[in-house]
Amino acid sequence: MAPARAGCCPLLLLLLGLWVAEVLVRAKPKDMTSSQWFKTQHVQPSPQACNSAMSIINKYTERCKDLNTFLHEPFSSVAITCQTPNIACKNSCKNCHQSHGPMSLTMGELTSGKYPNCRYKEKHLNTPYIVACDPPQQGDPGYPLVPVHLDKVV
C-alpha cells in the first residue's frame, strides 16, 4: 500500500499546484469588484489593436493571458443583456444571459512572447455572446444585475 500511496502523492501535489496557479491567474485585482474587472477585461466600445489593449489587462496579472474577447459596446448595453432570460452557464449555474443578437467583438489569441512582450492575433466577429450576471456590489453601477464573467461566444 505505501508504494502506491507514495506514487500518487506527487501527482496530487502537481494537480493542486496547477489548480492554484489557474486560480491566481483568474483572480481579479483586490481593488476591483467582479463587474469592474469584467469591464476592464471585456468592454471596449471603440475597437483597439489587441496587442496594446491586452498589455493593459496583462499588467494586472503580470502574465500573458492566453485568450481574451473584447465586446465593442458600452457597459450599459452589456448590463442590459443581464435582463434577458436566464440560461445555464458552462459551469451549470443558471445566472447566464445571451445577448439580444449578434454583436461586434474581437477575440485576441496569444501567439508569442513572454510578459510583458505578449503578442496577439486578433479575429473580428459579429456574433452573440453569453455573460454571467450577479447583483451589483458596492461601487458597481446601479443595474439590477451586472455582468461578471464572459461565459461564451456563440
UniProtKB/Swiss-Prot annotation:
Expression sites by tissue = Expressed prominently in the placenta and is not detected in any other tissues examined.
* Signal peptide feature range: 1-27
Q: Does the keyword Chloroplast apply?
A: no
What are its GO biological-process terms? antifungal innate immune response; defense response to fungus; defense response to Gram-negative bacterium; defense response to Gram-positive bacterium; innate immune response
EC class name: hydrolase
Localisation: Secreted
Gene Ontology CC, one term: extracellular space
SS bond list: C50-C93, C64-C118, C82-C133, C89-C96
**Positions contributing to substrate binding:** K65, D66, L67, N68, T69, K90
Q: Where is the active site?
A: H42 (proton acceptor), H149 (proton donor)
Please tell me where this protein is predominantly located: secreted
Q: What is this protein called?
A: Ribonuclease 8
Which gene name belongs to this protein? RNASE8
